[in-house]
Amino acid sequence: MARSTQPSSLLRAAVAGALLTTVMAAPALAQERVVKIYGFGAKSGVVRIFGLNSEAAMKAAAEQINKAGGVTLGDGSKAKLVIEYLDDRCNAEEGINALRRIAAQPDAIVAVGPTCSNVAEPVFGILQKKAGDASDSGLQFPLYTDVAAKGGLASMSQWAFRNVPSEAAMYKSLMEWIKATRPDVKTFWGGVEKDFAHSNATYNLMKDQATKAGLEVQGQSEWLLADTSFSTQVREMKRAGTDMVALSAHPFTTCGVLKEMQRQGVKPKLLVGLTSSSSMETLQGCAVQAEGIIIPTSFAPVTPEAIKAAEAAQALNANMDLHNAAASKNIFTQKDLIEKNKLMARPDTLQADRQKMREALASMKETQGLLGKVGRTDDHEATKPFLFVQAKAGAWTVAERPAVN
């Protein structure tokens, strides 16, 4: 009898083991459902800090979403949000290649990026211009930009969307405020990173708005994004002796110019900076020399939500600024749109999900930003609240919150 029961016992043990394995595997399988949001931008090169900060902000947002239960898909199942971020090195060709690689993935519904305007413009150019146009073979993939800020780019394609502030509105308001509050400032000198699309475009806005505010534009100095010597340009400023110097430059060359201004004893009555330089990178690089500089920005840690977002980014060794603040909010917005529009996030629903995401982004009239409500325009741009910050004692302080907000 003992010999006859041994096979039966072994069989029962094997069945029990198989059932236990199945039961243990079931939760693991359930947890494997993911929604992947891709990003791309500059993670190397001179402006790499912006891409690195965007990636960190996106991952911090995803972490908050996952801790709260993840994303609810169209079939009611829960999915984990995963971020994958590609490096385009602020290079147009690499940006195009990055977006094509993303669009070729069977799990890619939408992407965030890029960092640089000189990448965004050609990238938007490969997208289908008018959604549903069978004669247009352009890429049919929704792109929600967080950083690239050159004006008007989203109108290039109905698949392109941006969550960047209007620098035209920001510098118009700033120059009007300077005119009203600083009657002693009458002359203007500009400095610009001549080889960078964003710097060039914004400098033209600064100069035009300064002229409209009644300031006398006396000239400009030019340098390149990768330059490290600015003695000639600062000598030009010194000879001009203007009341205001406006620098349309990113933190790296802004600090280089400010240090050279200190060395040569150039002390204008007022310093104005580029939106992108309203960052901790500027203060870490040249807080003493940047003392007093005024910059318009669409981010400052002045609301509970903004403080929370900044702390989440800091936990991943990143600083929050107007650019990656947008990257963070883009992730929360996409999570909401996935749920409201019942996206399935499966390979067999890929094209339908992309179309739903495009239509959802296009239909948005308003989103919630870190400083308040953000309006959406018909050409897929954002109307964001902003304020003016000033560098004081190694920190950014709010100088003014314009009434236009």
Functional labels for PLM-detected ranges:
Residues A2-V15:
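Bacterial N-terminal signal peptides that target proteins for export
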Residues F50-G74, N204-T211:
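Short, polar/charged alpha-helical segment
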Residues M24-A30:
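Sec/Tat signal peptide C-region and signal peptidase I cleavage site
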Residues I49-A56, V71-L153, N163, W223-F230:
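Beta-alpha junction/loop-to-helix N-cap segments that form part of ligand/metal-binding clefts
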Residues M261-I331, E339-K342, A391, W396-V404:
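Extracellular/periplasmic periplasmic-binding protein-like sensory domains
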Residues A315-N324, K335-V398:
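Segments of small-molecule ligand-sensing domains
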Residues Y38-K59, L86-A92, T115, G191-A201, ...:
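Extracytoplasmic "Venus flytrap"
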Residues A108-Q220, K269-I295:
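Extracytoplasmic ligand/sensor domains, especially the bilobed periplasmic-binding protein
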